[in-house]
Amino acid sequence: MKFTPPPASLRNPLIIPEKIMMGPGPSNCSKRVLTAMTNTVLSNFHAELFRTMDEVKDGLRYIFQTENRATMCVSGSAHAGMEAMLSNLLEEGDRVLIAVNGIWAERAVEMSERYGADVRTIEGPPDRPFSLETLARAIELHQPKCLFLTHGDSSSGLLQPLEGVGQICHQHDCLLIVDAVASLCGVPFYMDKWEIDAVYTGAQKVLGAPPGITPISISPKALDVIRNRRTKSKVFYWDLLLLGNYWGCYDEPKRYHHTVASNLIFALREALAQIAEEGLENQIKRRIECAQILYEGLGKMGLDIFVKDPRHRLPTVTGIMIPKGVDWWKVSQYAMNNFSLEVQGGLGPTFGKAWRVGIMGECSTVQKIQFYLYGFKESLKATHPDYIFEESNGFH
């Protein structure tokens, strides 16, 4: 037998330097979470795997604040959660209303169109949320099957209020789908109390777990819609009836669906255990306090926040306006090269306009915020010696 020679690049050891991940995600994981991934790989029907999956479901119901039986994980990053919700709840010709003021709602538009949905949109500026009145008028006008909202937009640092939206949706026989990828465990979230029908979040964001697994939950009302589809879900991999069966959500004998990443489930279990040990209230309070320290520190540098109204700022992701004449990329590169500090640029509506800093995972402490402020300031000084640090007036 003859084969091509092995690649020379694989003869070298794998060396990944430590980085302080203070962008909008993924975030740094704790040693406890990383160690969990070193457990032995388990097969699809090992009892220890099913026990851990049950514990993960318990933890997810806690952080979502729900009693939903159909609470589970899909394999893939947070985009997988968006795909799973839209592909299961929408059929060809179904009308969906998407509130667009950031890149994630734009992605939802594209995905919904690919499934043949009748997509209607309302659009708003990326630094201001939609009012309850605006959403109510749009629902009354379009009479959609589903409304899609982004709770916390990591492309801008905007927080969308949700209280009251679910009630309005249900008055018009509409399901509420929520993207809580960047917000969950950083601000209050009550799935059942707020009458949310479908939600997904990102393991690699505030939760502090690795990417590649996405927690989701669907209400009994949404589950009934899926069970009564005219056609099967177009994507076998995201079929929540099949996947939910494997996760033990439906009081049925479990059937193999696909090979899950057992070691990511172990890691997520430990991340959820850490949240449970500290308590949701304390987790959220800590991140809000860290965000306030960040705001004050940036204000002393003369920097402005992309979302002007403090009531609408997402504590877990802050957009920092790039001053005129400043090369944002030089600042980011200097911070990484000299401090191993991630200073990430904007995305979507903030690309070229703002940096984005995340208060997520292990980077949600006063010490980490102080280090970020120091590294960011030194990077700005080194790359732009003429920049004048004058305290901003519009910061508090």
Curated annotation (Swiss-Prot):
Presence of keyword Protein transport? no
Q: Which residues lie in coiled coils?
A: none
Q: What does this protein do?
A: Catalyzes the pyridoxal 5'-phosphate-dependent transamination of both 3-hydroxykynurenine and L-kynurenine to xanthurenic acid and kynurenic acid, respectively, preferentially using the alpha-ketoacid glyoxylate as the amino group acceptor. Although glyoxylate is the preferred amino group acceptor, transamination of 3-hydroxykynurenine also works with pyruvate as the amino acceptor in vitro. Involved in the detoxification of cytotoxic metabolite 3-hydroxykynurenine generated by the hydroxylation of L-kynurenine, an intermediate in the tryptophan catabolism pathway.
Biological classification of the source: Eukaryota, Metazoa, Ecdysozoa, Arthropoda, Hexapoda
Q: How does activity depend on temperature?
A: Optimum temperature is 60 degrees Celsius. At physiological temperatures (30 degrees Celsius), retains 60-65% of its activity.
Q: What does the annotation say about its assembly with partners? A: Homodimer.
Q: Which Gene3D superfamilies does this entry report, sorted A to Z?
A: Aspartate Aminotransferase, domain 1 (3.90.1150.10), Type I PLP-dependent aspartate aminotransferase-like (Major domain) (3.40.640.10)
Report the main location listed first in the record. Answer: other
Q: Name positions with the PTM N6-(pyridoxal phosphate)lysine.
A: 205
Q: Give the pH-dependence text from the record.
A: Optimum pH is 7.8.
Which positions bind pyridoxal 5'-phosphate?
77-79, 154, 204, 256, 259
Question: What protein does this entry describe?
Answer: 3-hydroxykynurenine transaminase
Molecular function terms, GO-annotated? alanine-glyoxylate transaminase activity; kynurenine-glyoxylate transaminase activity; L-serine-pyruvate transaminase activity; pyridoxal phosphate binding
Annotated GO biological processes are: glycine biosynthetic process, by transamination of glyoxylate; glyoxylate catabolic process; L-kynurenine catabolic process
Q: Which organism is it from?
A: Anopheles gambiae
Q: In which tissues is it expressed?
A: Expressed in gut and ovaries.
What does the sequence similarity comment in the record state about its family?
A: Belongs to the class-V pyridoxal-phosphate-dependent aminotransferase family.
